[in-house]
From Swiss-Prot:
GO terms, biological process: UMP salvage; uracil salvage
Reaction equation(s) it catalyzes: UMP + diphosphate = 5-phospho-alpha-D-ribose 1-diphosphate + uracil
Entry-linked InterPro entries: PRibTrfase_dom (IPR000836), PRTase-like (IPR029057), Upp_B (IPR034332), UPRTase/APRTase (IPR050054), Ura_phspho_trans (IPR005765)
HAMAP family reported in the protein's UniProt record: Upp_B
Cofactor note: Binds 1 Mg(2+) ion per subunit. The magnesium is bound as Mg-PRPP.
Name the record gives this protein: Uracil phosphoribosyltransferase
Pfam families: UPRTase (PF14681)
Pathway in which this enzyme or protein is active: Pyrimidine metabolism; UMP biosynthesis via salvage pathway; UMP from uracil: step 1/1
GO terms assigned for molecular function: GTP binding; magnesium ion binding; uracil phosphoribosyltransferase activity
Gene that encodes it: upp
Binding-site residues, uracil: I193, G198, D199, A200
Cofactor needs: Mg(2+)
Record-listed E.C. numbers: 2.4.2.9
Native organism taxonomy: Bacteria, Pseudomonadati, Pseudomonadota, Gammaproteobacteria, Pseudomonadales
Broadest EC class assigned to this enzyme: transferase
């Protein structure tokens, strides 16, 4: 199964705070960034390094850097923006590509309305970020788009994932690893994750939440 649930105590603690029904926009937004940063730490643990020489205080010293072109972070709009600052706090030199995906509330199917990809994306690791992996349709559509653009290495980070979404991504793109803070129980009849976080986009942006 192409998924890794990160059960670090800090992540579990922060995710518990995010599940509160009475959480403020400010606190939800800050916690989304913090958990995004912690997931980034785990999702980049196996990146390839290369050596190079620098002038240190005592002379030349060999140090390491991440090999290859700069990573591109791919937030799925709009909710993915809520994790972006947390990811960039650890990878400040990353390039940002943006993909806008909207979900039909009746069919639960996704359609892409925006794509702004960085140059030479075929030579970069792409890290997709989205708070929720529910039906998986938005994630699958984004991966489809990236692969069509030539991207060969793709990873995804989500705060909460439903088994249905995991299965959809695994079926369509078994080569893409998903990192999540929690694998939750299920989707309800409206396509919301249970117990989930509610509508993460509305909580991040302070807009009116729909009934689950």
């Amino acid at each position: 199964m192409p998924i890794r649930e990160i059960r670090h105590p800090l992540i579990r603690h922060k995710l518990g705070l995010m599940r509160r029904a009475d959480i403020s926009t400010k606190n939800f937004r800050e916690l989304a960034q913090e958990v995004g940063a912690l997931l980034t730490y785990e999702a980049t643990a196996d990146l390839t390094l290369e050596n190079y020489d620098i002038q240190g205080w005592a002379g030349t010293v060999s140090v390491e850097k991440i090999a290859g072109k700069k990573i591109t972070v791919v937030p799925i709009l709009r909710a993915g923006i809520g994790m972006l600052d947390g990811v960039l706090s650890l990878i400040p030199g990353a390039k940002v590509s943006a993909v806008g995906v909207a979900r039909n509330e009746e069919t639960l199917q996704a359609h892409t309305y925006l794509e702004k990809l960085v140059p030479e994306i075929d030579e970069r690791l792409a890290m997709i970020i989205d708070p929720m992996l529910a039906t998986g349709s938005s994630m699958v559509a984004t991966i489809d788009l990236l692969k069509k653009a030539g991207c060969k290495e793709i990873r995804a980070m989500v705060l909460v994932a439903a088994p249905e979404g995991i299965a959809a991504v695994e079926k369509a793109h078994p080569d893409v690893m998903i990192y999540t803070a929690s694998i939750d129980e299920r989707l309800n009849e409206h396509g919301y994750i249970i117990p989930g976080l509610g509508d993460a986009g509305d909580k991040i942006f302070g807009t009116k939440q729909k009934d689950a």
